[in-house]
Amino acid sequence: MTLLYILGAIVMLIVILLFIALFLPNGYFIEKSAIIKKPCNFVMDRVADLHYYAQWNPWQQKEKNSESNITGLPKRPGHRYSWKGKKIGAGSLTLRDIDEKHVHFDLEFIKPWKARARDNWLFEEWGNDETKVTWQDFGALPYPMGRLMGYMVHKNLQRQFTEGLNNLKRFCEM
């Protein structure tokens, strides 16, 4: 009888979590900015040329021995950075579009779970030879687990974007 109560409580908890997930956001949006003491073109080149990516991105810094591969022409649509590691999983970042002030990437995660996101970068002249860099990312949070984990995803990405922009700032200003 006790086992039946425990099983009933577990089923009830699952039903409650599924119900809560119905009302949670089905996507996320992150935006962080930083001022870098270098001209706009210089900073934009360090983001749009993925040969520099491992030097400043916060995920690569966590697993420096991970495998990576860069294909395509720098600063051109189709330019791609792929990675594979035990800690950072596997995926790719592909330049989708670029203009004078923006760089847009498609982000695809393969491991530990499949997901897609969009990365957008805005570069604005700011003061004397300074650049305001804005990094945006948005993606879907699938029902139910993605939605239930949405708060943690958002919180972790906020921290990682701050770390990434600080790394980019140090890399550009050295």
Predicted regions and their residues:
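Structured, soluble extracytoplasmic/luminal domains of envelope-associated proteins
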Residues: 79-126
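Generic recognition of short, well-ordered alpha-helical interface segments
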Residues: 38, 45-48, 90, 156-159, ...
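Hydrophobic ligand-binding cavity/cleft-lining segments
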Residues: 4-74
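Beta-strand/loop substructures that line and gate deep hydrophobic ligand-binding cavities in soluble
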Residues: 106-162, 168-170
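Structural motif marking the loop-to-transmembrane transition
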Residues: 3-4, 145
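Eukaryotic helix-grip
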Residues: 54-64, 90-92, 96-104, 138, ...
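A short, structured loop/turn motif at beta-sheet edges
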Residues: 37-41, 96-102, 122-132, 170-174
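Charged, low-complexity, helix/coiled-coil-prone segments
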Residues: 35-40, 60-68, 100-117, 170
